[in-house]
Amino acid sequence: MSLVRGHGDIAATTAAPLSEEGEVTSGLQALAVEDTGGPSASADQAEEEGEGGREEAEHEGSGAEEVQGEAPSPEGEERAKGESEDWCVPCSDEEVELPADGQSWMPPPSEIQRLYELLAAHGTLELQAEILPRRPPTPEAQSEEERSDEEPEAKEEEEEKPHMPTEFDFDDEPTTPKDSLIDRRRTPGSSARSQKREARLDKVLSDMKRHKKLEEQILRTGRDLFSLDSEDASPASPPLRSSGSLFPRQRKY
């Protein structure tokens, strides 16, 4: 018993302090060795207990170092506090416009007394401010109902306008040609722009028929209708020389 206890004391002094569970297990192992009864077995058991205690102590030491590494250092705590305290509040306009003495503007007591007396006497104070001119109001946009009311009126006006005939308005009905010999001479005193000329299909057709009739007359008689009229008016005038063209001279209509 003494030897076992002696070896157990040596192992306890060389190894790191064990936990409570480790002590219980080591005690049970010592009792088991005592029952078997052998000095060599007890010595081996003591050595094994010493090695196990060393391993447990090393493991506990490494865990403590990891915990210490994870814990924030005092310098890091001071920096975090400094960053949290580094804040500012923007100044108001009154603080920016403070005079050199650092006191805000206040009217003199005499002015305050005068204003209170005016309020007591009249009840209101006149506003002393420059009134700027205002621009005219923006016209309101027309609603859809007003637009719909204006559209039928515009359509009615377009329908009421008379149709102006053009040369491309074809009419299949036969029309009587107008007199081909129209006197274009204007009377003195009348303006040259008294009548507006309009292109009409019936006028174009009448001109075509008139030219065709003149060509047939020239081919049949060899003379123009205008030359016959001039010969009847003045028989003593010399005859015109015939040329190879269909229209020997320029005609005026």
UniProtKB/Swiss-Prot annotation:
Residues 51-62, 195-223 have a biased composition (Basic and acidic residues). Residues 116-160 are annotated as: Sufficient for interaction with NCOA1. GO terms for molecular function: nuclear estrogen receptor binding. Residues 142-159 have a biased composition (Acidic residues). GO terms for biological process: DNA recombination; DNA repair; positive regulation of cell cycle G1/S phase transition; positive regulation of intracellular estrogen receptor signaling pathway. Its main location: nucleus. Residues 1-109, 128-253 are annotated as: Disordered. Disulfide bonds: none annotated. It is found in: Nucleus. Transmembrane segments: none annotated. Its association with the histone methyltransferase MLL2/MLL3 complex is suggesting a role in epigenetic transcriptional activation. However, in association with PAXIP1/PTIP is proposed to function at least in part independently of the MLL2/MLL3 complex. Proposed to be recruited by PAXIP1 to sites of DNA damage where the PAGR1:PAXIP1 complex is required for cell survival in response to DNA damage independently of the MLL2/MLL3 complex. However, its function in DNA damage has been questioned. This is PAXIP1-associated glutamate-rich protein 1. It comes from Bos taurus (Bovine). The gene is PAGR1.
